[in-house]
């Protein structure tokens, strides 16, 4: 009855205290089944598709325009595939398709699942920050990541990364401007646009990592392609908009 509420009916803003994103390269044939028919994989050299894990510490997350005191602080984890979508106007949008979402608080799970299609679940988050190393882990979700705190950008790309340099790697750093959700029953695509300024993520050296969810997808060859972090950035998401998808490529704007 109130399913329309899941379509991001209002803009939302937050302050990102930190956003750490690890991007993994996978052969495109192995990722295709993870995305809906309306989207295309955003590939590199027509060979690699990408799955990113984003870990974001938000502050004062709230409907846009509301006072900060009404906001809440949450830790958010998102597993996303890099994709493209062609709009009814013929624009080719780069964005993300979310395949799993987690948070550290039940309140975010509750309201997130009312106002989005992201199917949040609550998990434990353990953060251990020392002078040179930051570790983030979860017992329930079975993940652990340890990085060196960036002192400069003169660090090497991860071994076996498909990118030649960090400049090339930044194209797949995330988050991208758009996030997409698809309803196969009525062939409608929900488009969420994120807006930020001064987005200049810094490369980080990953000491160790393990993500049970990535293991559970059963991909045969997953390679860490890059890792970036950014601090203290205001961010907001516009109200969602919907387009009717036509397999022949003639999309129509719904509202």
Region spans (language model):
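Interaction-surface and assembly-scaffold signal
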Residues: 117-255
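Aromatic- and glycine-enriched beta-alpha-beta binding-site module
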Residues: 60-142
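Hydrophobic, proline/glycine-rich low-complexity stretches
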Residues: 1-64, 195, 199-202, 210-212, ...
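Aromatic-enriched hydrophobic runs in primary sequence
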Residues: 10-11, 31, 54, 58, ...
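Short linear motifs at secondary-structure transitions and domain/linker junctions
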Residues: 15-17, 25-31, 51-59, 71-74, ...
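Low-complexity, intrinsically disordered regions enriched in charged/polar residues
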Residues: 6, 10, 25, 92-93, ...
